[in-house]
Structure formats: structure tokens, C-alpha cells
Amino acid sequence: NQNAARHSPDRRTKESPVKKSPWKLDPLFTPRSIAVIGASPNGGAGSIVLRNMQRLGYTGTVYPINPQYKEIFGYPCYASLRDLPAPADCAAVLLGSRSLLPMLEEAHAAGVKGVWGFASGFAETGGEGRAMQRRIHDFCHESGLLFCGPNCVGYANITDKT
């Protein structure tokens, strides 16, 4: 019925009963640029993430980070976050657990606002891993760096193709 469709409320414009988060999560979920730390053309997580971004149709700027390559899948590759022409909104850290905290510190220093970490070996492994995870938590809390992880297989915002 045409008349019913015209007068039914549009759910997208209604005020949500859910409280808004005090955190601005756009750098994680709608980034204009993404750095992929540990990018590689040779398989593994760094290759899969880049290919998934291409398949999804991500239209933002992609910065593969790996000092071993000049280009990966048509994207110019950079040695580190410090070498980027502009800070990335988000960084995906696809390295081992011992590299995660130093990369979070580098990301924060480079102006990155959000980081996704794909590494295991934290609280799920016991004492030392739990202590590493606590240091990551403390750093992100103190610095204001948004962090999804550790040990996160990733996420996708299908609407915005990120």
C-alpha cells in the first residue's frame, strides 16, 4: 500500500533509545585511510587483509607497511608509519604479540587514532601474556588510542566498505 509506506516512520531517522558512546569510533569503523602493518603479497594475514579491502571496495587510502617491499597489489608500500605522507586514521597490526605494544606506541606517535590488532599470546596464555595485555590496555587508556584487540580476527563495516 503506497499510502502506508508514505506514512510509516523511517527507522533511520528515529531517535535511538540506546545511549550514544562517549568514544568517537569513526577511526575504527569509518576510517578514511588504513595502514596495514605487516602487509605482504605472499599470503598470510597481511595479504588477506589487503585483498579483502580490495574485494569489499574500500575507497579510502590504503598504506601497506613493510620495509621489504616498494609496492603490494598496486599500492605503494611504506617502511613505517613515520614514512606515510599523512597519518592514517586506522592501522591494522598483523604482527606477533611482542610487536603489538611497540606498534601501538608508534601508531600513537604517528597520529593514528585507531588500531586493530591481530595477534595471539595474551591473557589466554597465562601470566606473561596477561601482563602484556594489561600493558596494552593501560597504554591505550592513557593515550586515548582506540584499540580493537588483541587476538581479534577483524571486523567489517559493510555499509561503508571498510
Predicted segments — roles?
Residues 1, 9-162:
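Catalytic-core regions of core metabolic enzymes
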